[in-house]
Amino acid sequence: MSLYEYNDPIINKDLAQADPVMGQNRTFPTLEAWYDVINDYEFQSRCPIILKNSHKTKHFTFACHLKSCPFKILLSHQGPVSVQNGDGSPGVGVGDEHGHHHHHNMHAHHHHHHQNGHTNGHGNSGDDVSEQEAQQDDEDDDAAVTAAIAAAVAAVADSQETIKGPFAVTKIEPYHNHPLESNLSLQRFVLTKIPKILQVDLKFDAILESLCNDEDNTVAKFRVAQYVEESGIIDIIKQRYGLTDAEMDKKMLSNIARRVTTDKARFVLKRKKEGVYMLPNGHQISGADQHQHQLQHQHQHQHQHQHQHQHQHQSQDQHQNQHQQHVGNDNHVYQDRIHSQSDQDEAGVHNLDDNNVRVAAAAAAAAAAALQSRDSHVSEELKLNCGTGQDEDGIEDDNHSSKRQLHRSDRDRVAEALKMATRDILSNQNVDSDVNVDVDLVTGHKQLSPHDDMAEQLRLLSSHLKEVEAEENVSDSNLKKDDVQDENIQPELRGQ
């Protein structure tokens, strides 16, 4: 970052160092004497220097109007503070510009017209840059304007009394991060000084205060354009900063009027915060009445807040009642849905019972057919065996094995029929259990369901199958008894 030091015989690095001849820092007998120096510096460089802060009228910090610029000066009081009015409130030093400005009129005019080396050379280049800046927004220096308004108001509040010194610069950083050529034009520099002129020279707030007292605490009759023409602000600017009639064109007058409007708006806002703006004078008798008005305003605000709070509670109660009604309606709808679903499930249960009856009947018929087929086959074979009376060992063995296979196949068919019937019934029962109905709603249907009849039929079929197996075992044992072992056959018959 490039840094620039503007040439000045006083504002430089040596200002914070001891004078080799006198052996001490350069001092200023009053704060007004210091403002003579700093105002001349900012006028020549077209760079506004603002008062950043002050501490108990003993320490003052000045800085460049650009926030990013490192330029800074710390001015400190070197002895006991002596103020003519005894007021040691902060910001007194700014008010001393009032006396200085009258002294500075001819002084600044002298610099503007007769300093050809430093000021005019850089001023021309600054004017060239200003022609380009004219196309930009006129509010680029709003920060400087705001700071100037605050400083000027503080100056008026603390009157014109001079703070006696001595004062000395204890710290200085005289370098800027912007070249002299890029600084403000003379017109734009003057615009940054309008708030100070309004407050210090023209006592702008006092004028508005008087107008409020005469017009029921309003400034509605105040006309900015008329004030700019008749207040004398144009003459002050011309004399103090050397502007010509050509430089005071319409655009310049419009910008001055905008600054006046800004300061007027600040005053109105302050009165509104105090609660007295637009309040008739008959109601503003004393400070106690003003306090009472503020209390009434606060009470009205609290009452309005309570009313809003009650309205909010009523809205919440109404919303809750609507919600409960909505929930009740939902419950009725839900109960209707349950009853309709129960009716549908009742019909489904009857259908499932009919299906189970049909499946059980089919299974029983299949099992009975299988048993009947087996009995017929057994009777036919017994008749055939009795009629033929075959005594040969090979034929008897074949008949015995064929009977076993026949019994086994019949038993398998019956068992398979029972398994199929059982599987179908279980599948239908699963479907029945999957129906999404209440248990209590279907208990009556299950009591009247013919599942018990189906179970009874299956038990009968199972017991009948066991009897058949028992008969097969008895027949097998009888056949085994009829068989004669080889060792029991007489030897003389073995060869036959």
Swiss-Prot record:
Entry comment on modification after translation: Extensively phosphorylated on Ser and Thr residues.
Compositionally biased intervals (Basic and acidic residues): 397-412
Main location per the UniProt record: nucleus
A Pfam family per the record: BAF1_ABF1
Amino acid composition bias (Basic residues), ranges on this chain: 100-116, 294-312
Swiss-Prot/TrEMBL keywords: Activator, DNA damage, DNA repair, DNA replication, DNA-binding, Nucleus, Phosphoprotein, Transcription, Transcription regulation
Comp. bias intervals (Low complexity): 313-326
Residue spans of biased composition, Acidic residues class: 128-143
Protein name: ARS-binding factor 1
One Gene Ontology biological process: chromatin remodeling
Function summary: General regulatory factor (GRF) that contributes to transcriptional activation of a large number of genes, as well as to DNA replication, silencing and telomere structure. Involved in the transcription activation of a subset of ribosomal protein genes. Binds the ARS-elements found in many promoters. Binds to the sequence 5'-TCN(7)ACG-3'.
Region feature (Disordered): 82-143, 280-326, 386-412, 469-496
Location(s) in or outside the cell: Nucleus
Family: Belongs to the ABF1 family.
GO annotations of cellular component type: nucleus
Residues modified as Phosphoserine: S402
Gene Ontology MF terms: DNA binding
